[in-house]
């Protein structure tokens, strides 16, 4: 209870799902009430702004896809080139199995590809793919020949051993 002469006012606050605030004040003594609704439009996006942003996202989706494809193509080329570089220098891989002229051809192709990558930072997807084909055209036949030689050598020795067993 408030001292005599002090009005008793009941204030009710309600916030709905849209963030709209409804305030109701009622004077208990007179029964008179007032109501006000407060909306906070500042900082909120209008429907037009939302639609514009969706349109822009759709417009840029195609461009983003092209950029991703370009980056993937560049990464594919870089990965192949660095794998070749590692294989020809790693004794556990191809370093000991390559002839000097084969190693030189691969080293030259790798060096040229790395220089090309440095000089063509913003090349198109097709350019990266074309360069990858060029490097593969040099490296793959050599790698295939090395594997055939090493596979053929072990196959030859096993057939010799079998022949040896037949002779015994």
Swiss-Prot record:
Disulfide bonds: none annotated. Glycans are attached at residue 120. It holds the Pfam family HSP70. One of its GO terms (molecular function) is ATP binding. A motif (Prevents secretion from ER) lies at residues 165-168. PROSITE patterns: ER_TARGET. InterPro entries: HSP70_C_sf (IPR029048), HSP70_peptide-bd_sf (IPR029047), Hsp_70_fam (IPR013126). The keyword Glycoprotein applies. GO terms for cellular component: endoplasmic reticulum lumen. It is found in: Endoplasmic reticulum lumen. Keywords: ATP-binding, Endoplasmic reticulum, Glycoprotein, Nucleotide-binding. Residues 148-168 are annotated as: Disordered. Probably plays a role in facilitating the assembly of multimeric protein complexes inside the ER. Belongs to the heat shock protein 70 family. This is Luminal-binding protein 3. It comes from Nicotiana tabacum (Common tobacco). The gene is BIP3.
């Amino acid at each position: 209870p408030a001292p005599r002469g002090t009005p008793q006012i009941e204030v009710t606050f309600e916030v709905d799902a849209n963030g709209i605030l409804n305030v109701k004040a009622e004077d208990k003594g007179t029964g008179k009430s007032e109501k006000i609704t407060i909306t906070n439009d500042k900082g909120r996006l209008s429907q037009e702004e939302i639609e514009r942003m969706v349109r822009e996202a759709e417009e840029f989706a195609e461009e983003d896809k092209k950029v991703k494809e370009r980056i993937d193509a560049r990464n594919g080329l870089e990965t192949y080139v660095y794998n070749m570089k590692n294989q020809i220098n790693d004794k556990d891989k191809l370093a000991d199995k390559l002839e000097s002229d084969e190693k030189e051809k691969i080293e030259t192709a790798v060096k040229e590809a790395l220089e090309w990558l440095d000089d063509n930072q913003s090349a198109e997807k097709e350019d990266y793919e074309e360069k990858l084909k060029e490097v593969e055209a040099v490296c793959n036949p050599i790698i295939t020949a090395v594997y055939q030689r090493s596979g053929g050598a072990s196959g030859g020795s096993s057939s010799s051993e079998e022949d040896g067993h037949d002779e015994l």
